[in-house]
Swiss-Prot record:
Belongs to the jasmonate-induced protein family. It comes from Populus euphratica. It comes from the Eukaryota. The lineage of its organism: Eukaryota, Viridiplantae, Streptophyta, Embryophyta, Tracheophyta. This is Jasmonate-induced protein homolog.
Amino acid sequence: IDASTATGDSPVFTATIK
């Protein structure tokens, strides 16, 4: 999980995938 990569409408969702 890389929270720093979180972007867009769903930062939490993006961070979870990364």
